[in-house]
């Protein structure tokens, strides 16, 4: 642990916590700090100008990252008949109805995301206490309850990420891996920011995107100058 601590301290010394870094410099620093033996994730934290305690200011949604997430995703789908076949053809690993519900109740959850056709919610609704705490409960707001299950599966496989503001008004999301090229990370970040802008509550006043910071799994936070995000 001491070795990791010393490395983290060395990286922290390179980063000015008060400075706003141009996006290119921020990505360069974050990638440099990602020196663990595994391919660290590159994460973003976005402080929003909303009151997270108000139900009409809860920011939630999903976005397909153009460069993907660098993670292989296993998808489970609640569907029947033709929609079940479409889900399988789109690449879903697990497709079912009551049988899938029983697997979940038995603790067999070898998947990363759950998608449901609207007509299956009578079954899915009984799984709220199991799927909810794990962040797996299908929801129309993030596109996981939809009649077009095939597209939902394809989006999940293509690098879709879900986001939801926490109690502190912050959005946390992964935009790729340390092995990604800076251009890929930047395009993913831009896609996320665009999605957040579209999800801005009508009742939100003042500055909406207050702070943006990047970090790797084992690295330190680097603040981003938002003005440089718009520059091409």
Swiss-Prot record:
The answer on whether this UniProt entry bears the keyword tRNA-binding reads: yes
Q: Which domain of life is it from?
A: Bacteria
Q: Which InterPro entries match?
A: Ribosom_uL1_bac-type (IPR005878), Ribosomal_uL1 (IPR002143), Ribosomal_uL1-like (IPR023674), Ribosomal_uL1/biogenesis (IPR028364), Ribosomal_uL1_3-a/b-sand (IPR016095), Ribosomal_uL1_CS (IPR023673)
Task: Return one GO MF term.
Answer: rRNA binding
Q: Name one Pfam family in it.
A: Ribosomal_L1
| Coiled-coil spans in chain | none
Q: Which SUPFAM superfamilies match?
A: Ribosomal protein L1
According to the record's subunit comment, the protein's assembly and interactions are:
Part of the 50S ribosomal subunit.
Q: What is this protein called?
A: Large ribosomal subunit protein uL1
The gene name on file is: rplA
